[in-house]
């Protein structure tokens, strides 16, 4: 995919033959790429991405709950990873489709062929951070994210041309936090539309879901 993005016509044709879905949905996949990466040279020094939302959600856990956490839960491989998978998959499903979100999830997890063959080494099985258990948990979280994304898309009537206001984004993310609250039996500090992260990500959503090629061309011309 990276070779196709940065390479020539032959690289792009090769991806089209190997993965027609990628070629057909190239535009939407590119928009997801921008939402999932911090692009400071295009969106400014304070650019934010999916991961920043997950990180903030982990910070939103009520401080009284932290004493109950296992040390690993407070790490990047703990709740942040869980929130990142579910929240990103929910947003991708809401913005685009469950099919696209599922495709991206499968491509990400299939970096390990052992997940399909089931032939794991003992070292892989014992590796809780990067082994099969981690991947399978991610896959389950991806599915829950997609279900949340479908429900929230209907609740807020979100369409491709929907303008993402800070209020809409805060409400959307608070609904996801309510799901975490019910599932994990933990209290969360709600997002506010005045939060800087909410303002920045809602702005980015509107750019990415709008005339993205025009924005990118203009941003790169100013470098």
Residue ranges and their predicted role:
Residues 1-103, 111-223:
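Intrinsically disordered, low-complexity, mixed-charge
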């Amino acid at each position: 995919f990276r070779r196709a993005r940065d390479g020539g016509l032959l690289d792009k044709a090769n991806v089209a033959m190997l993965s027609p879905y990628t070629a057909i949905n190239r535009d939407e996949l590119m928009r997801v790429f921008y939402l999932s990466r911090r692009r400071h040279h295009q969106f400014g020094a304070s650019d934010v991405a999916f991961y920043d939302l997950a990180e903030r959600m982990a910070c939103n856990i009520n401080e009284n709950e932290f004493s109950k956490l296992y040390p690993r839960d407070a790490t990047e491989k703990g709740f942040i990873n869980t929130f990142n998978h579910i929240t990103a998959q929910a947003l991708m499903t809401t913005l685009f489709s469950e099919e696209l979100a599922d495709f991206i999830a499968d491509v990400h997890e299939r970096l390990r062929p052992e997940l399909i063959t089931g032939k794991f080494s003992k070292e892989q099985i014992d590796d809780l951070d990067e082994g099969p258990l981690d991947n399978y948990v991610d896959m389950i979280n991806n599915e829950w994210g997609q279900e949340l994304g479908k429900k929230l898309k209907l609740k807020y009537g979100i369409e491709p041309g929907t303008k993402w206001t800070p209020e809409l984004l805060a409400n959307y993310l608070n609904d996801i936090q309510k799901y975490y609250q019910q599932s994990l039996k933990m209290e969360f500090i709600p997002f506010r539309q005045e939060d800087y992260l909410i303002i920045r990500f809602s702005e980015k959503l509107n750019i990415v879901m709008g005339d993205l090629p025009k924005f990118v061309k203009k941003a790169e011309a100013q470098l």
